[in-house]
UniProtKB/Swiss-Prot annotation:
CDD domains reported in the protein's UniProt record: CDP-ME_synthetase
PANTHER family: 2-C-METHYL-D-ERYTHRITOL 4-PHOSPHATE CYTIDYLYLTRANSFERASE, CHLOROPLASTIC
Name of the protein: 2-C-methyl-D-erythritol 4-phosphate cytidylyltransferase
Lineage, uppermost ranks: Bacteria, Pseudomonadati, Pseudomonadota, Gammaproteobacteria, Lysobacterales
Enzyme class at the top of the EC tree: transferase
Amino acid sequence: MTGSIWAIVPAAGRGTRFGGPLPKQYLQAGGQPLMAYTLAALAAHPALAGIMVAIAPGDADWPGWTAVQSKPVLTCLGGATRAASVLSGLLALPESVRADDFVLVHDAARPNLALADLDRLLEIGRGDPVGAILAAPVRDTLKRAGDDGGIDGTEPRERLWRALTPQLFRRHQLIRGLTEASAAGVEVTDEAMAMERIGLRPLLVEGAEDNFKVTTPADLARFEFELANRDCGPGTRDPESAHPQSSVSASAFSGPGSRAPGPEEI
């Protein structure tokens, strides 16, 4: 596959659930901000053409990266919500990106994406007229709570999935979905929800359980544990679980903050 897919990374949020002075995407793990691993995971795929990062106005923590693994990294101003940031990124993509081209959307603080998962998402999603998302089947027993905190019942889990990212959609359809949701005053919590609102049915592509989002200190500790115990990238472990972030060289990132996570630091 040639580099034809752009990825949008919404990174304008403050991560209030995590606490602390830094937005969670800039928290350090293995000596580098989480977002360095996120961008490296995306850029490792040959189909990726570039990355658009939606950052907050006046973001003093943005390292100023302009490329990763020779793939361009562009920035635009994000909005007050995730949906607004993604829409801003969609509208700011280069003129070469057509309306019916597929685009990826990936969480800035979801740094543990495996190359095999991204490859499978692109292969399946680009064969569908709508697109697809990475997701994981719900395996725990689900309880429905009453107002008093008691259990009102047990929910069937056979058809329930947890939505992950990346999510892959055609540019013009996602713009329409996000725009209509905003006009209706509906806060969508992921891009698939915006697509559902306009009557479209994306596919579910099963992804790895360890493609988690860092939202709490425990999540950060889990990712640091993953780094400390990870083999050094593709070729040294089962390729189905290889994480390209492990083998990114220190010269992979360009721009003012051009240090990237190298294997010697992991």
